[in-house]
């Protein structure tokens, strides 16, 4: 279908009639685009601005965007779409526009009273962003922060600036309030929280009355699924909200502070269809843990996945007419150990719609793979007990290394190769903690497993339980062991590129050149040998024998059957018999036996209906 036949135009030059829109919604261009794939957005959040040319060469058309016939943006981040839908409860559609930053001057006029911005990383201080920009030295500003500043400059310099107030929301708003960057960026008010709240609408009413907004406002998160708004328009990457909250109570996590809610199946699917209707061919269900959906506030603990409910939801999403691609969001690794059958059957349902190909790793006929985002964070049991004591439930956190290895075995077997985040330099981290994490990384390598390990320097994010704590803040503060952990992760991440001899060779040679030219002076004395490790300058065993690196000790990893035995007796009834490896003493549980007999005698019975709720009402 041609652009004009679908109502899509690729540029808009006409000025709006009248005095501009009453309310203008926007976001940085780097957070809006989706046609170049997920990789470019992740790169823009991490790479310094001076490396933008690399992305420009690989994706020369990344700035080209699509418009609706009226000049409004064809797609927007999900948060902006939720705000738009929330405002439409109070205001006329003709009073509101979502536009790209380059088109702000076409919609802002004397009648404009509010410009509302959603931004993820305006100052470049999220988990991964500061790490890789500071490694390279000359600029710590990542690409997406540059484009955020460019957007704010356009808003601040508009000739009608005196007529409107600028409100900022999104996950990066705290960066502005914490650094007091209001005047620098031309921001009047930072709003923390969701746009569905009555407080958010009250702020818009206040601004429209001409009243001065407070600099910072905290608004409430919806407390139940009925309060959450689903937009009816296309979102960037086809993001459709699936759950809020998580429930594992990690100290460093912002979303876990939100209520644990799984959203209704029918409303999720309706938003999927809305994305397809507006031209989207890719869908991603947004969640902090995909495996809790269908098991929130039921008679079964959320860390035992509702297999039938999840299969039903994902099958309906990928089989929606018009959906050509589906990308997984966040997950935890313990559920893979709890229910490997779920991983197997889910793979059968969704992998054919994955746009990700990993020829060196995948056993899929078309070399397709699934790459969810999974938190490893640390391999140290001592650190895990302090930072994330519930990360491994239903298994005890003492078994975290075994849960990670066994979970990764199950995932890899079915062509899941997760992107696993690690935190380096958290408060009170010791050399022993770093060694314990390296032990896990080397164990993954010894067992020929694979994950994309994404290390980042500790960032005490606003409103987390660790706000106000201090760990490593700059790369030149990293110890040699911490540098080794970072470089070992990135060396292992090169494995998917081993299909060609030249790609890893060029990368490693380039690393040595950068080290000799600049990086050895910028990143401290502990950087040199880890960089040689990354570049493959000499065998790791030799560097270890010289005392320059830590090689990682082999770990004793429990089998899945041994892990199942560590589950509390009261929880064993929720382990499904068809997953295998069931310990003998599980049979002694009366609840487990009752459950087993009931399922055997009721073939049509499924966990989709055994939650104790009416299935139609919930899903």
PLM regions and their residue ranges:
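Glycine-rich beta-alpha loop elements in corrinoid/cobalamin-binding modules
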Residues: 79, 97-225, 230
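Catalytic cores of alpha/beta
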Residues: 177-185, 428-443
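N-terminal [4Fe-4S]-dependent radical SAM core
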Residues: 3-22, 34-38, 72, 201-240, ...
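Radical SAM enzyme core and accessory elements
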Residues: 1-54, 488-619
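N-terminal pre-triad scaffold of radical SAM enzymes
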Residues: 20-24, 29-30, 221-256, 269, ...
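Flexible glycine/acidic-rich beta-alpha junction loops that bind and position SAM and/or redox cofactors
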Residues: 115, 124-127, 177-178, 284-300, ...
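A solvent-exposed, charged loop/short amphipathic helix patch at secondary-structure junctions
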Residues: 39-70, 122-150, 300-305, 386-396, ...
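Conserved SAM/AdoMet-binding glycine-rich loop
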Residues: 274-417, 424-426
């Amino acid at each position: 279908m041609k652009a004009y036949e679908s109502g899509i135009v690729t540029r808009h030059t006409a000025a709006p009639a009248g005095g501009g829109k009453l309310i203008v919604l926007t976001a940085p261009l780097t957070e809006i685009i989706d046609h170049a794939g997920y990789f470019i957005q992740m790169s823009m959040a991490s790479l310094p601005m001076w490396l933008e040319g690399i992305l420009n060469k690989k994706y020369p058309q990344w700035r080209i965007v699509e418009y609706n016939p009226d000049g409004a943006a064809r797609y927007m981040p999900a948060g902006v779409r939720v705000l738009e839908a929330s405002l439409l409860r109070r205001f006329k559609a003709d009073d509101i526009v979502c536009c790209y930053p380059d088109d702000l001057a076409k919609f802002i006029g004397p009648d404009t009273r509010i410009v509302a911005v959603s931004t993820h990383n305006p100052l470049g201080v999220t988990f991964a962003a500061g790490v890789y920009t500071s490694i390279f030295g000359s600029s710590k500003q990542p690409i997406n922060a540059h484009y955020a500043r460019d957007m704010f400059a356009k808003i601040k310099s508009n000739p009608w600036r005196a007529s409107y107030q600028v409100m900022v929301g999104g996950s990066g708003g705290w960066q502005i309030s914490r650094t007091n960057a209001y005047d620098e960026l031309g921001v009047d008010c930072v709003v923390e929280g969701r746009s569905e709240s009555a407080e958010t609408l009250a702020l818009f009413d206040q601004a429209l009355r001409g009243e001065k907004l407070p600099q910072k406002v905290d608004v409430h998160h919806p407390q139940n699924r009925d309060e959450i708004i689903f937009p009816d328009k296309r979102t960037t990457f086809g993001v459709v909200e699936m759950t809020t909250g998580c429930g594992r109570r990690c100290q460093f996590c912002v979303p876990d502070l939100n209520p644990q809610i799984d959203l209704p199946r029918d409303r999720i699917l309706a938003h999927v269809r809305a994305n397809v209707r507006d031209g989207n061919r890719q869908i991603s269900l947004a969640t902090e843990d995909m495996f809790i959906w269908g098991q929130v506030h039921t008679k079964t603990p959320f860390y035992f996945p509702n297999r039938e409910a999840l299969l039903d939801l994902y099958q309906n999403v990928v089989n929606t007419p018009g959906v050509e691609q589906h990308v997984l969001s966040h997950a935890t690794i313990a559920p893979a150990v709890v229910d490997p059958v779920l991983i197997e059957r889910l793979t059968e349902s969704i992998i054919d719609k994955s746009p990700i190909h990993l020829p060196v790793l995948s056993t899929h006929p078309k070399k397709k793979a699934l790459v969810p985002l999974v938190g490893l964070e640390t391999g140290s049991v001592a650190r895990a007990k302090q930072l994330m004591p519930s990360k491994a439930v239903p298994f005890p956190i003492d078994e975290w290394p075994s849960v990670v290895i066994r979970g990764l075995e199950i995932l890899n077997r079915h062509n899941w190769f997760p992107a696993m985040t690690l935190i380096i330099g958290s408060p009170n981290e010791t050399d022993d903690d770093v060694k314990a994490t390296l032990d896990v990384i080397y164990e993954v390598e010894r067992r020929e497993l694979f994950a994309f390990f994404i290390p980042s320097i500790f960032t005490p994010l606003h409103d987390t339980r660790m706000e106000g704590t201090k760990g490593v803040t700059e790369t030149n503060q990293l110890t040699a062991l911490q540098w080794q952990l970072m470089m070992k992760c990135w060396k292992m991440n090169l494995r998917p590129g081993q299909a060609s001899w030249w790609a890893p060779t060029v990368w490693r040679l380039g690393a040595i050149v950068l080290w000799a030219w600049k990086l050895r002076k910028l990143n401290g004395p502990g950087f040199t040998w880890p960089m040689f490790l990354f570049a493959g300058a000499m065998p790791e065993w030799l560097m270890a024998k010289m005392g320059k690196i830590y090689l990682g000790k082999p770990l004793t990893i429990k089998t899945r059957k041994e892990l199942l035995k560590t589950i509390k007796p009261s929880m064993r009834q929720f382990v499904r018999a068809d997953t295998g490896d069931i310990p003998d003493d599980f049979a002694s549980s009366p609840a487990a036996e009752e459950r087993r007999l009931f399922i055997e005698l009721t073939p049509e019975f499924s966990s989709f209906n055994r939650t104790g709720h009416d299935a139609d009402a919930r899903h």
